[in-house]
Structure formats: structure tokens, C-alpha cells
Amino acid sequence: MSKLLKCEQTFSEADTRFYTQQVVEAVRYLHGRLIIHRDLKLGNLFLNSNKVIKIGDFGFATKLAYPDERRKTICGTPNYIAPEILEGKNGHSFEVDIWSTGVILYTLLVGKPPFQSKDVMSTYKLILMNSYDFPTEMTISSDAKNLTHKILQVLYNKR
């Protein structure tokens, strides 16, 4: 998907919806089997010839023993990492994949991740402050913006 984004630069809302829906279904499948991917990003989403997404690179994935289990491993890709992983206080669970899905959604619409910065520490600070905006020069519907805002909530229980 990252190669396709480089060619396209941004996706239409219809295409973004098409791909995001597939990511959500794949994440639902994983979570139903108590698997957290923990590194969802465009570079780990692969398209087949029918434009069907397959999730790859399960190197950071973990299988929980029970649904309420929480993990404390710090892992993921800086632009996509959830704030609760950075904070590390109460651990993390399925909600980190939801956060990353929101970052993917934004990235498809805008062409770059919402918290992208000049260096990793600045990116982490922006994530923890939930500091991002939609470019004013882009026409993005209020529905798409609202969905993104609902997913990219710092408090994981609000996602």
C-alpha cells in the first residue's frame, strides 16, 4: 500500500473507505482470535491483483491468553504507534490496532501520517498531545474528519 500511496499521493474518500473497511475487517478477524498486530501501517498492508488487502509482518504481533490481558512491550512504528504504548503505564491491548487504523485512514486521505515530524521524539510528543490537523487546502468531508477524530482518541477506551 505504501508504494501505491507514493504513486497516488492521496486517495479519494471512496477509495479510502474501500481500503479502510478491509483493514477493519482484517483487524476484527485478528482480534477475534486474540491477536494484536501492533505494527499496522501502510508498509505492512499488501494488495493482491483484485485490490484485496492482506496484512503482513507479524513480527510485533502477540496472542493474548484472555481478552482482558494487557501487554507492556514497547513496539511499533513511530508514526503509527498508539499513545498508550508510549506511556506504558497500564499496558495496551486491541485498541492499539484501532489507533493505527485511524493513522492509516488519515494517511490515505492526506498523503502523510498525522503526527509526522522532523524527528522521532517530536512525533511521540505530537502523538501524546494528539496534535494534528487536516490541511485546510484539502477538501475532506466532515464525516471523514469526524471518523478520524473518533478513532484517534488519546484515551483508548474512547476509541
Model-derived segments and spans:
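AlphaC helix of the protein kinase catalytic domain
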Residues: 1-11
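A conserved short helix/loop substructure at the end of the activation segment
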Residues: 152-159
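Activation segment signature within eukaryotic-like protein kinase domains
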Residues: 19-20
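Conserved end of the kinase activation segment
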Residues: 85-95
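Structural helix C-cap motif within protein kinase domains
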Residues: 110-113
